[in-house]
Amino acid sequence: MTFNHKKMEPKWQQYWSEHNTFKTTEDKDKENFYALDMFPYPSGAGLHVGHPEGYTATDILSRMKRMQGKNVLHPIGWDAFGLPAEQYAIDTGNDPEEFTALNIANFTRQIKSLGFSYDWDREINTTDPEYYKWTQWIFEKLYENGLAYEAEIAVNWCPALGTVLANEEVIDGKSERGGFPVFRKPMRQWMLKITAYADRLLDDLDLVDWPENIKDMQRNWIGRSEGAEVTFKIKDSDETFNVFTTRPDTLFGATYTVFAPEHELIEKITTPEQKEAVETYKKQVELKSELERTDLAKDKTGVFTGAYAINPINGEEVPIWIADYVLIQYGTGAIMAVPAHDERDFEFAQQFGLNIRPVLEGGDVTKEAFTGDGPHINSEFLDGLAKEEAITAAIDWLEKEGIGSRKITYRLRDWLFSRQRYWGEPIPVIHWEDGETTLVPEEELPLLLPKATEIKPSGTGESPLANLHDWVNVTDESGRKGRRETNTMPQWAGSSWYFLRYIDPKNTEAIADKEKLIEWLPVDVYIGGAEHAVLHLLYARFWHKFLYDIGVVPTKEPFQKLFNQGMILGENNEKMSKSRGNVVNPDEVVEKYGADTLRMYEMFMGPLDASIAWNENGLEGARKFLDRIWRLFVTEEGILAEKVTTTANANLEKAYHHMVKTVTNHYENLRFNTGISQLMIFINEAYKQDSIPKEYVEGFVQLLSPIAPHLAEELWEILGHTETISYVTWPTYDETKLVEDEVEIVLQVNGKVKSKITVAKSLGKEELEKIAQEDDKMKENLEGKTIRKVIVVPGKLVNIVGN
């Protein structure tokens, strides 16, 4: 006998919708719980089975917390700006707005079919002008506080996409989306000064409960380095340049210096003999992406400028080279090379026959760089010193001589914030003919994205908005002409603050009401994929800290607990993708097995953070378990089974209380697979009984409800209840019922285990000895032996010594 999910699931989804069951309560006498999913990008492909894994996890927590008497905020929305919709629109001639609306409608249908307890009244969409009004407002505040600025910088220009890409969007010299070639090109761009928050972004990781590997990824991305900035003079010139080094103690081993090919001094210092070689090399470098330039495995390339610098610590002349592995945007765009103790410098020196001088004892620098630690040699006043002492002594000397100083640098760069695309938030800025730049007045926000029929990139580096002359060209009251900013914001903008808008999504006066922000922040649990470990999470933390500084939000950090669900792979253990043809559509699973089965299966596959292959057999197993529950409690006629009674059953008492305790604990700690195992153990025990107390059945159904809510609601109704199960008080357990009154005793002969027995915990030594001697297996092993000694450890063992 099986239940009819096709009838049952729509019935309860309609009930929840009509009764507004999951509307967020804001009862001042209750604690608040904010469970957040990483909101989806509504693609044309719709949901795949990977999406519901994280959504089910937050839904289980949300449903449990409601039953535990908390106000629960569990919202959903759409991260709907961005390249894919625009690319689709360009390829098909469709309007990205219409395409996005269709996709959202499809995603909404799919998500509702899975029974998630979202508060749909709080739905947000980053492309809604009432939403992006506040994205623009945040940008204006950043600008007013000196954290948004324009700069001419070398950017990753992708001609095929017609836009600039952030470093994070370039993989192996190609665009992350589409795999198109990417080139370096100087362009005017909007930047956000995330570097101003580097230390706080680093230090405040200690305030949050996040996976350590995600914290480490952020720490590495920020890349705080302590060292010294050292000034080198250029021979026969008044020019100087600075290098940053974490090892100023190795200055005596600096035998050459290297500039980034874009360094401003190159033109001034290159000798006539080297000019042609330098120009040729610079042109070659323009075609390389940052990743190609810094690839450790590639052959080293470079060219000598003909100029020399003076090593400030020993007065030696050292040649100045240019090489692509030095990047202008990192450090100072120039390095001192210590080939004896750095692998990359060593390879470069080997390639071009440059001097290699060891300054640390250890290794054979004729064969390879020695990168370990050892006492200093060939270093005058540093000789014999260990690393830390030598670093301190070197910096002290540099500062005393006025040619260097202690410095902290970061790997983190400012955030490249503009995109040369149409489908994004307009940047609310006007450039006037007299050179002034002003913000669109706050009362005129949102600055609406104009309708456009032709949204192909201009190809010049300007966005398609540049073609909309009526929108771009403006005149102020005094007749001064200006042009609107034509770049748009990146997709990261809307997702950097969306969790704040859920708290008060209809507010027209502010991002959200201040009191409500105090009530709900920080987010209690945030679940999503690890692929957002650096970018989204770093950007959201940056904006949150800025909003904290200007008094908008009450907390330093946005997300208290973060959890990354694993990836659901195809049956062949490969990532699901359209090209591989192994994508599983949840619609088909819901149609065949039901939403509760999909939810149960995805939570039972393994630990939530593990990546596991999809398996149809596992789905069938999950459905069989749900059918087993149904058959135990419900008759063929659809009424409550007779074995569900109001009488007590001592045989189930311990199993029930153990289940309540364990399942509650496992749900709280996101160990849903082991929680489900406990539900299975109880059902197995219940099948062995002639009667099951109704109280236990109700408690079981409540524990089941966060995972299989439709089935649980149906069973709850059959149990005689007229209200939804969603707010019934969560079951409690009695610790005294869990106390073991029996214990397993090991029986030994001459220290070797011969038998095991279960006895009352209260038995004393004499009774245990008697039982041991009467045990059949012990009798067999003691036959013909004289008992010399009996050792009894109550609650553990009886050992009979004989010969």
From Swiss-Prot:
Q: Which UniProt keywords apply?
A: Aminoacyl-tRNA synthetase, ATP-binding, Cytoplasm, Ligase, Nucleotide-binding, Protein biosynthesis
Q: Which GO terms describe its biological process?
A: leucyl-tRNA aminoacylation
The domain of life for this entry's organism is: Bacteria
Motif 'HIGH' region in this chain? 40-51
GO function terms (MF aspect): aminoacyl-tRNA deacylase activity; ATP binding; leucine-tRNA ligase activity
- InterPro entries named in the record: aa-tRNA-synth_I_CS, aa-tRNA-synth_Ia, Leu-tRNA-ligase, Leu_tRNA-synth_edit, M/V/L/I-tRNA-synth_anticd-bd, Methionyl/Leucyl_tRNA_Synth, Rossmann-like_a/b/a_fold, tRNAsynth_Ia_anticodon-bd
Record GO cellular component, one term:
cytosol
Q: Where does ATP bind?
A: 578
Substrates-to-products reaction catalysed: tRNA(Leu) + L-leucine + ATP = L-leucyl-tRNA(Leu) + AMP + diphosphate
Tell whether Chaperone is among the UniProt keywords.
no
Q: Name one Pfam family in it.
A: Anticodon_1
Q: Where in the cell is it found?
A: Cytoplasm
Main location per the UniProt record? cytoplasm
* Keyword Transferase among record annotations: no
Motif interval(s): 'KMSKS' region: 575-579
Residue ranges that the Swiss-Prot or TrEMBL entry lists as coiled coil: none
Quote the EC number.
Answer: 6.1.1.4
Q: Which family does it belong to?
A: Belongs to the class-I aminoacyl-tRNA synthetase family.
Name of the protein this chain belongs to: Leucine--tRNA ligase
Q: What is the lineage of its organism?
A: Bacteria, Bacillati, Bacillota, Bacilli, Bacillales
Name the gene for this chain.
Answer: leuS
